[in-house]
Amino acid sequence: MTTSVYSNLKFLGIACVVAVAAVLGACSEDDLADKSVITVDKVDYTEFDYWLQRNYVKPYNISFKYRFEDIESDMNYYTIPARYELAVKLAHLVKYVCIEAYDEVGGIDFTRAYFPKMIFTIGEWEYRNNGTYILCTAEGGRKILLSGVNYLEEHLGNADDLNTYYLQTIHHEFTHILNQTVNYSADFQLISGADYVADKWSQAPFNTGCLQRGFISSYAQHSHVEDFAEMLAMFVCNSERQWDAWMAEAGPEGERIITTKLEMVKEYMLSAFGIDLEALRSALQRRQFEVTSGLVDLDDLSLD
């Protein structure tokens, strides 16, 4: 009985060895694939890609990403990709009203040196739990996220809307990047001192009456860092007439505080980067008017 079991096991062992050898032999005879089984996402170049190469990458070394990428997104928010045709319009808008305005006033070398090297776009706003939503963010001085691209069409003919949802936020975030390169005077944060309220800026009573308290916007009350960026962005993106109306609403004390801050912002930009904010505002206002008046073709992808 023992001998029979042993013989059977021995036979099975030999059979297994033969089977394995046959399998390995068969495998060794197969031709290896000439392509790796590990693939990287590949995309077909569009007219837009070639236009971006000519107008963003070549002159400025800026990557304008309009295709959705998980790695560039903030997974704390639900969002969607930017629509192709609206990403095209936004790329024109950013180039004409922002990038080329800095070229005009500060020279192309300034823009090449300091403007963020990546612009990543998403279709939806990033909504927060406190009832606000994120329009734009800057990361590490090299990347700007632009959200809400899919709403661009409805705002293109209105300068105030373009400022509120897109242009002011771009200049605001660019200011943060400049501040990371050259810091502003610590005296700035002493002007409003203990009046900053952090995340309470969007809640009553801080969501009204900011001008009278010496802040150019409600969000400027968040911190001195946001206050500085808001001062620059709100000044260059809005007309002299609008600014004067805000100062009248602010009253004597509010106007005094805001004017003190503005002078420090102007001095910072001129001394640190050679940028005249009055000249920059003039350039932006002219370019903004040309866009909202339909004088700039935001769909043109020609390479001529």
Tell me the role of every PLM-derived stretch:
Residues M1-F11, V17-R67, S293-D304:
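Bacterial Sec-dependent N-terminal signal peptides
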Residues D31-L32, V88-K143:
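Auxiliary, metal-adjacent structural segments of Zn-dependent hydrolase domains
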Residues I62-A82:
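Acidic/histidine-rich, surface-exposed loop or edge segments in extracytoplasmic proteins
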Residues N76-Y84, T132, E153-Y165, G214-H222, ...:
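Second-shell loop/turn segments in exported
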Residues Y102-F120, T181-V182, Q242-P252, L277-A283:
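Surface-exposed patches in mature extracellular/periplasmic domains of secreted proteins
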Residues D160, T164-S185, A229:
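Active-site recognition of the HExxH zinc-binding catalytic motif
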Residues Q180-D199:
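Short acidic alpha-helical/loop segments enriched in Asp/Glu that coordinate divalent cations
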Residues Y196-E278, R287-D304:
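Metalloprotease/metallohydrolase-associated module, dominated by Zn2+-dependent proteases
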